[in-house]
């Protein structure tokens, strides 16, 4: 059985190998002497700490809710695959609905650690491994809004063609 220290070192090594793909982090490691895995973990812990204690919590959660999805959305737009486009379009619809509801209900004042929960929720919504936005969309938004966006042809859609053909017949 491996000790917690061994497991932590294993995961730090995995993270270090993954972060080695990014030249900016390699340069940071060379110039500061701080291993890039420790620097990234430190920044993530600091970011989470600031959110937990609401030191810029609103701004930091909105950056997390926008930054990661914006990167993935742009990546999806420049790819040939259309499935990821649908995933990110779904995210932006859910994110917009959440933002509107959040602005209407002042939940911040009566919900302790609101921004921490919002941060975790936005990560769950946005990270492709969880596909939280798809779950929310299919469970709540699609059943509610689908009746307004039915793509069958309504009776009035052929009205112009019928009027044109009736005018020609006379």
UniProtKB/Swiss-Prot annotation:
Q: What species is this protein from? A: Pyricularia oryzae (strain 70-15 / ATCC MYA-4617 / FGSC 8958)
Q: Where are the transmembrane segments?
A: 36-55, 57-76, 87-103, 106-124
Q: Which InterPro entries match?
A: TB2_DP1_HVA22
The gene coding this protein: YOP1
Domain of life assignment:
Eukaryota
This protein's domain notes: The short lumenal loops between transmembrane domains 1 and 2 and between transmembrane domains 3 and 4 may impart a wedge-like configuration, thus deforming membranes.
What taxonomic lineage is listed for the species of origin?
Answer: Eukaryota, Fungi, Dikarya, Ascomycota, Pezizomycotina
Stretches of the chain found on the membrane's Lumenal side? 56, 104-105
Function according to Swiss-Prot or TrEMBL: Required to generate and maintain the structure of the tubular endoplasmic reticulum network and the vacuole. Induces high curvature in membranes and causes membrane tubule formation. Involved in membrane/vesicle trafficking.
Give the way it sits in the membrane: Multi-pass membrane protein
Self-association state and partner proteins as the record states: Oligomer.
The main place the protein resides is endoplasmic reticulum
What name appears for this protein in its UniProt entry? Answer: Protein YOP1
Cite the entry's keywords alphabetically. Endoplasmic reticulum, Golgi apparatus, Membrane, Transmembrane, Transmembrane helix
Thylakoid keyword on record: no
> What GO cellular component entries does it have?
endoplasmic reticulum membrane; Golgi membrane
Regions of this protein lying in the Cytoplasmic compartment: 1-35, 77-86, 125-170
Q: Where in the cell is it found?
A: Endoplasmic reticulum membrane; Golgi apparatus membrane
């Amino acid at each position: 059985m491996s000790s917690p220290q061994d497991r932590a070192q294993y995961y730090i090594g995995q993270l270090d190998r993954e972060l080695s793909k990014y030249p900016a982090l390699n340069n940071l490691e060379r110039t500061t002497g701080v291993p890039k895995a420790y620097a990234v973990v430190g920044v993530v812990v600091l970011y989470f700490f600031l959110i937990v204690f609401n030191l810029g919590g609103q701004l930091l959660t909105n950056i997390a809710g926008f930054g990661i999805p914006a990167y993935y959305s742009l990546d999806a737009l420049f790819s040939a695959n259309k499935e990821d486009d649908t995933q990110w379009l779904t995210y932006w619809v859910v994110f917009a609905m959440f933002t509107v509801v959040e602005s209407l209900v002042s939940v911040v004042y009566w919900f302790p650690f609101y921004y921490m929960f919002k941060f975790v929720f936005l990560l769950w919504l946005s990270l492709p491994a969880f596909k939280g936005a798809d779950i929310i969309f299919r469970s709540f938004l699609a059943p509610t809004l689908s009746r307004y966006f039915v793509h069958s042809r309504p009776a009035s859609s052929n009205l112009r063609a019928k009027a044109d053909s009736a005018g020609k017949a006379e």
